[in-house]
Swiss-Prot record:
Its main location: membrane. It comes from Treponema pallidum (strain Nichols). Belongs to the ABC transporter superfamily. One of its GO terms (molecular function) is ATP binding. PANTHER family: METAL TRANSPORT SYSTEM ATP-BINDING PROTEIN TM_0124-RELATED. InterPro entries: AAA+_ATPase, ABC_transporter-like_ATP-bd, Metal_Ion_Import_ABC, P-loop_NTPase. The lineage of its organism: Bacteria, Pseudomonadati, Spirochaetota, Spirochaetia, Spirochaetales. SMART domains: AAA (SM00382). Part of an ATP-driven transport system TP_0034/TP_0035/TP_0036 for a metal. Probably responsible for energy coupling to the transport system. This is Probable metal transport system ATP-binding protein TP_0035. The keyword Phosphoprotein does not apply. Keywords: ATP-binding, Cell inner membrane, Cell membrane, Membrane, Nucleotide-binding, Transport. Residues 10-231 form the ABC transporter domain.
Length: 238
């Protein structure tokens, strides 16, 4: 498929979404232009529409209104839920090699290459269900790299991982963003990581989105939240 030339990886225009015609809208008239090579963190409260936005970008859902245009050829993803892998006695290598065959990639060496890239080549003979949360995330990132993606989409990457593991994961992801020039879209609940690693932050609140850079996010949203928290505390003390 021929991809039109564009400075953007993904372009959302006036995108709204609801599951049925009589249901409430989860996303409301979202406009979002994601430049190629960007590292975009999607943040917001639970239920604000973050995972829905990711599913729309991955074409797992269709927008109720508006359009989503992709200007990249290959998309990799790391899902939030990975439990299905834990029920099968596969080694790390077997799991990734199965995915390589699914993508019809002929070169077997790519499995070792992506494991090396994420620092997990020494674990290729380990059973997947024996891995720690951080190790499993690295394996799934390696899996997403097998198809040499132009766009990498991740949903709550740091969930269930200790602070040291999170630090390793974010360093890896930032390195991939730089070395491969891969565009990253990451649903994020770790605000410190979003502010530190992102080139852009997309803040969702009740289905409405606002795009800003990390510095703007700190001044416009975090400071506002601190002021609200202080006001609430003062009310309770009266």
């Amino acid at each position: 498929m021929r991809i039109m030339a564009s400075p953007f990886a993904v372009l959302l225009q006036n995108v709204s979404f609801r599951y049925t015609a009589d249901a409430r809208f989860i996303l409301h008239e979202v406009d979002l232009a994601i430049p190629k090579g960007a590292y975009l963190s999607v943040v917001g409260e639970n239920g604000s529409g973050k995972s829905t936005l990711v599913k729309l970008v991955l074409k797992l859902l269709k927008p109720s209104t508006g359009t989503i245009a992709h200007f990249v050829q290959r998309v990799g993803s790391v899902p939030q839920t990975k439990m299905h892998t834990l029920y099968f006695p596969l080694t790390v290598y077997e799991m990734l090699n199965s995915y390589r065959r699914l993508l019809r990639i002929s070169h077997k060496w790519v499995v070792d290459a992506v494991l090396e890239e994420v620092g997990m080549r020494g674990a290729k003979k380990k059973l997947v269900y024996t891995l720690s949360g951080g190790e499993l995330q690295k394996v799934y990132i390696a899996r997403s790299l097998i198809g040499d993606p132009d766009l990498l989409v991740l949903d709550e990457l740091s969930t269930g991982i200790d602070s040291r593991g999170q630090k390793d994961i974010y360093a890896l992801l930032k390195g991939l963003n730089t070395s491969r020039n891969v565009t990253v879209i990451s649903v994020e609940h770790n605000l410190d990581a979003a502010i530190t690693n992102s080139t852009q932050i997309f803040h969702l609140s009740e289905g409405h989105g606002h795009l800003c850079n990390p510095q703007q996010y700190v001044s416009e949203f975090l400071d506002m939240q601190k002021k609200d928290a202080l006001a609430c505390a003062q009310c309770r003390s009266r």
